A protein has these predicted regions:
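Gly/Ser/Thr-enriched, mixed-charge loops and adjacent short helices
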Residues: 96-209
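Short, electropositive, low-hydrophobicity segments enriched in small/polar residues
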Residues: 1-8, 39, 46, 68, ...
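An N-terminal, well-structured beta->alpha segment
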Residues: 1-51, 55-56, 137-170
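N-terminal small/polar loop signature for handling phosphorylated ligands or for N-terminal nucleophile
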Residues: 20-24, 28-95, 185-209
Length: 209
């Protein structure tokens, strides 16, 4: 449960340990994308993760509320070193979680995950702290969601041409989750008539119906 088991202090360690391990496998300060769903705890957890990354010297690009597949796609597209999705999938709003993706937009290898877990428990973690100009930087890149919409249009427009008719309507239930920010854009870009429901997230109504 967010802010109970999954505390900001724990999330900070997850991020700092992750930045350390990623740096070991790279010759530069890593750049990490962060995306989240609509849960009320998302901002809290993202803030703690960002602090952990920056404190080690990693750089962060915040994607804001965005579907998990979009984060995976953008990780590879933007040539980021890794990404993090803050979400608890189908669970109700009280829960939240953190998932790392590799630079290929796939789940990080088990051995890297184990390294991160080991470093989280290490007393050495506090010794690795960036100072002065070595501190990481953060920027908001919610605009990158449009790159994902363009990807859909470019790759699926021809396949959906036969459905661009007045008598074909798609109903989409976004469950007040991360898809709520992109469903309208995607189906409009594809030229498909659509009706969207459960599309007004308020932080606590995700997966409610």
């Amino acid at each position: 449960i967010a802010n109970t088991e999954l505390t900001p202090e724990l999330v900070y360690k997850v991020a700092k340990a992750g930045a350390y391990v990623l740096s070991k496998h790279s010759d530069h300060a890593p750049t990490i994308l962060i995306g989240r769903d609509t849960r009320i705890s998302g901002t809290l957890i993202e803030s703690a993760m960002t602090a952990g990354f920056l404190s080690y010297g990693a750089n962060v690009k915040s994607l804001g509320v965005i579907p998990t597949p979009a984060v995976a796609y953008l990780t590879k597209k933007m040539k980021a070193d890794a990404s993090v999705v803050i979400s608890a999938s189908h669970n109700t709003y009280e829960f939240n979680g953190v998932k790392y993706f590799s630079n290929k937009g796939m789940k990080i290898p088990d051995e890297i995950e184990e390294e991160i877990e080991e470093m989280m428990d290490s007393e050495k973690l506090n010794d690795f702290t960036a100072v002065n100009e070595k501190i990481g930087t953060a920027e908001v890149r919610t605009d990158l969601l449009d790159e994902y919409v363009y990807f859909f249009r470019k790759n699926f427009e021809e396949e959906f041409e036969n459905y661009n008719t007045d008598d074909f309507v798609v109903a989409i239930d976004t469950a007040n989750g991360a898809t709520s920010v992109v469903a309208e854009k995607v189906f409009t870009a594809l030229g498909i008539k659509h009706y969207i429901m459960n599309n007004t997230p308020n932080g606590i109504n995700i997966n409610q119906n």
